[in-house]
Swiss-Prot record:
Pfam families: GidB
InterPro entries (alphabetical): rRNA_ssu_MeTfrase_G, SAM-dependent_MTases_sf
GO cellular component terms, A-Z: cytosol
Name by which UniProt lists this protein: Ribosomal RNA small subunit methyltransferase G
UniProt key word Methyltransferase: yes
Localization, UniProt: Cytoplasm
Keywords, alphabetical: Cytoplasm, Methyltransferase, rRNA processing, S-adenosyl-L-methionine, Transferase
One of the record's GO molecular function terms: rRNA (guanine-N7-)-methyltransferase activity
Top enzyme category: transferase
Role description: Specifically methylates the N7 position of guanine in position 518 of 16S rRNA.
Claim: Ribonucleoprotein is one of the keywords in the record: no
Gene, per the UniProt record: rsmG
Source organism of this protein record: Mycolicibacterium paratuberculosis (strain ATCC BAA-968 / K-10)
Region (Disordered): 1-23, 226-248
Listed EC numbers: 2.1.1.-
Length: 248
């Protein structure tokens, strides 16, 4: 059970090293009501947990609190535009639950698995899922591990946010997808440059129709930038070698 503390500026005591101030968690924007509908209260509770326990446990920087809605929750939920009804998705390197938890709240029809290699983060995710009452599975593991691939292969979509460069991310994502399933990686403003840099490796890993799309243009400034790639064929054995998964 999470206990929400007041989130506000913290002044260091005399003689203490300077600490970065904790920003204020703002109210949910109007667009959140449209995205989350009757589950807005669940999204608000998640925002509170991120702004308190998420900061205390080092999963979110203290200066990110006032940007939780736009930069983190809505940015993640916007990917729902690219998902079909009832899609089975896996969130690779879920960290604090982004983008998987906002997607699960906005789209209860989705089957969501949160994959996270670090114990403290997977424990946090389990607590959050229980607190919010979500039908979401939390798994501690890495995308490149054989047991993970055997159990969670054939997904409709593999989503991620700020996990790794596209060469590694594609190698981890493609084996978890069904034929024509899609990797949806939330990236920054240089996504197109990254695609150009790694396109050859992505193709060798079984990716096709690689493109950069935007989501949430009606309510996000800037909108979410997503690299979309379809699994066209099984990845070449050499391109799926085991490596260390990225962390946030």
């Amino acid at each position: 059970m999470f206990h929400v503390k007041h989130v506000g500026p913290v002044e260091p005591a005399a003689g203490d090293p300077e600490v970065p101030p904790v920003a204020e968690l703002g109210a949910a924007p109007e667009s959140a009501a449209a995205l989350f509908g009757p589950r807005l209260a669940t999204a608000q509770r998640y925002a509170e947990v991120l702004g308190t326990a998420g900061v205390e446990r080092g999963l979110l920087g203290p200066r990110e609190v006032d940007r939780i809605w736009d930069r983190h929750i809505l940015n993640s939920a916007a990917v729902a535009e690219l998902l079909g009804r009832g899609d089975r998705i896996i969130d690779i390197g879920s960290g604090a639950g982004l983008p998987g938890i906002p997607l699960a709240i906005a789209r209860p029809d989705l089957e969501v698995v949160l994959l996270e290699p670090l114990l403290r983060r997977s424990e946090f995710l389990t607590e959050v899922v229980d607190e919010l009452g979500l039908a979401v599975e939390v798994v501690r593991g890495r995308a490149e591990e054989r047991p993970v691939r055997d159990r969670f292969g054939e997904r409709d979509a593999a989503v991620s946010r700020a996990v790794a460069a596209l060469d590694k991310l594609t190698k981890w994502s493609m084996p978890l997808l069904r034929h024509d399933g899609r990797m949806l990686a939330i990236k920054g403003e240089r996504a197109a440059e990254e695609v150009d840099r790694y396109r050859r490796v992505m193709t060798a890993s079984g990716a096709a129709d690689v493109r950069v799309v935007t989501c949430g243009a009606n309510y996000l400034r800037p909108p979410a930038t997503v690299v979309s790639a379809r699994r066209a064929k099984p990845p070449h054995p050499k391109s799926a070698r085991t490596g260390k998964a990225g962390t946030r």
